[in-house]
Amino acid sequence: MAKANEIKRGMAVNLNGKLLLVKDIDVQSPSARGASTLYKMRFSDVRTGLKVEERFKGDENLDTITLTRRAVNFSYIDGDEYVFMDDEDYTPYNFKKEQIEDELLFIPEGGMPGMQVLTMEGQLLALELPQTVDMEIVDTAPSIKGASASARNKPAIMSTGLSIQVPEYISPGEKIRIHIAERRYMGRAD
């Protein structure tokens, strides 16, 4: 058991008999005195794949479930399945494209370090990505010499099809660092 304010992204909870994986959390602090902070959580139902949204007060208890995390690397595509290989014992983990559609936007060709699969009692639940990823821009408006001092953004398309806002001075072919959860530009990659 954990309080709602202790729940983090990537944790699993048992809610009304459903096994739910926490995808996103919004914290809402009401301005009225004495009002408790609300936590709006977006879940993915592990069994059905449906998205579920619930609100909790900070002191409400939730039934957490212990998950096993295994480090993996992207291996290959087999039809509509994506195969990830365990780094230690080379166990293959197969995901259907629909299961990891959002995550695929952040996985560059050849994979990325820091990926993990979440399992519970041998059942494959989800693919978890690291906080950031370095990607190459394939298309964006040309950079402007002497761009204004104000921070203006423009859309940029990555090699995976992901579109995010980047500063005006960034040009195609540059590698940038992206915060995965917030889908935002963090800076140029090393």
Swiss-Prot record:
GO terms for biological process: peptide biosynthetic process. GO terms for cellular component: cytoplasm. CDD domains: S1_EF-P_repeat_1, S1_EF-P_repeat_2. Signal peptide: none annotated. It comes from the Bacteria. One of its GO terms (molecular function) is translation elongation factor activity. Belongs to the elongation factor P family. This is Elongation factor P-like protein.
